[in-house]
């Protein structure tokens, strides 16, 4: 089973692409973006390399709800429907966590919470478009600049991956493992 922690920027990008795609008057609508592809894999619980389980926390869901309402200017009903759908995806793999360890040195508390959630949930991959924000100097080994790194801790090791690279790996059926 592939255990994915999807950063909030991926959920937001997928929602925006979907909303643009359904606006008949907007010709800039996008479909089949990397973010949409990843969200669809989580929704279906399956990928070209096997089953998919979502790792997410209640704190991440609360933050996503706030971003949808305050920054995307969408109404509460849309935000709640989106959050409820994500909660259901997480229940498929029973990986809704309460939080993390509190000992990782990241500048941004939201990014810290996401990384801690990925570790607490034993994610194989943390997928984020904000790659550089998750690099912890002494604990992270960069494999491909701005695209792929391995985070090591005593509790768990995981791969931090840009969505484009993650989608490329999934479509090829070749997912690297931590050596």
Question: How should each PLM-predicted stretch be described?
Answer:
Residues 1-56:
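Short, well-structured N-terminal submotif of metal-dependent ribonuclease cores
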Residues 18-28, 104-105, 136-144:
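Short, flexible/disordered intra-domain loops and linkers
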Residues 42-101:
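PIN-domain endoribonuclease scaffold, especially VapC-family toxins
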Residues 132-179:
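Acidic, PIN/NYN-like endoribonuclease modules and their adjacent C-terminal/linker elements
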Residues 62-63, 99-106, 165-171:
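A short acidic, often aromatic-flanked loop/helix-cap motif at beta-alpha or helix-coil junctions
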Residues 8, 58, 129-131:
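Short secondary-structure boundary segments
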Residues 88-126, 131-139:
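Active-site neighborhoods of divalent-metal-dependent phosphate/nucleic-acid chemistry enzymes
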Residues 12-14, 63-65, 134-137:
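Short catalytic/ligand-binding loop motif for oxyanion handling, primarily in non-cytosolic enzymes
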């Amino acid at each position: 089973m592939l255990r994915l922690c999807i950063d909030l920027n991926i959920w937001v990008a997928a929602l925006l692409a979907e909303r643009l795609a359904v606006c008949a008057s907007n010709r800039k609508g996008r479909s089949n973006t990397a973010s949409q592809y990843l969200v669809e894999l989580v929704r279906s619980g399956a990928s070209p390399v096997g089953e998919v389980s979502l790792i997410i926390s209640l704190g991440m869901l609360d933050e996503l709800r706030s971003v949808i309402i305050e920054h995307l200017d969408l109404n509460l009903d849309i935000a709640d429907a989106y959050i409820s759908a994500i909660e259901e995806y997480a229940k498929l793999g029973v990986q809704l966590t309460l939080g993390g360890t509190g000992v990782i040195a990241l500048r941004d508390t939201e990014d810290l919470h996401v990384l801690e959630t990925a570790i607490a949930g034993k994610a194989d991959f943390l997928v984020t478009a904000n790659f550089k924000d998750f690099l912890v100097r002494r604990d992270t080994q960069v494999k491909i600049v701005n695209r792929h790194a391995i985070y090591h801790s005593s509790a768990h090791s995981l791969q931090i991956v840009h969505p484009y690279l993650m989608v490329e790996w999934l479509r090829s059926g070749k997912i690297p493992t931590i050596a």
